[in-house]
């Protein structure tokens, strides 16, 4: 990952991913995020991970099919749904969406595992997206929800 990323593991919340090296790290803003990484120079450029309990759903597919969920997120953010993909990460279905707003670009991943909804959100300006998209794709692709 070119030395730009380093491993981050949250054993209490049960996930791991690569995070940007040298960015500011903020722990838990309840109801908003569990951890946030923020670019030192461009504070609007962030990576956030949040978890919330789910009572009955065991898969992100319980939220709806991929296009429907993607369209809902795009509408709620007044953004265009550029791409929607699903993948299997160690037995858990993950939905990934690329959204483009008027001023920003967002890569978002959703997964339900062990009674929790996991959300990984990466945001940067549209101007910076061409330079940052590979970094963000690597971060989202590195996300693994599992017990430790």
Regions found by a protein language model. Give the residues of each.
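Short amphipathic alpha-helical signal-transduction/dimerization elements
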Residues: 140, 144-148
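Short aromatic-glycine motifs in intrinsically disordered, low-complexity regions
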Residues: 4-16, 133
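Conserved polar/disulfide-associated segments of primarily extracytoplasmic proteins
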Residues: 1-4, 24-119, 124-128
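Proline-anchored loop/turn motifs at beta-strand termini and strand-loop-strand connectors
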Residues: 12-30
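Solvent-exposed, polar/charged alpha-helical surfaces in well-ordered, non-transmembrane soluble domains
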Residues: 17, 21, 71, 134-141
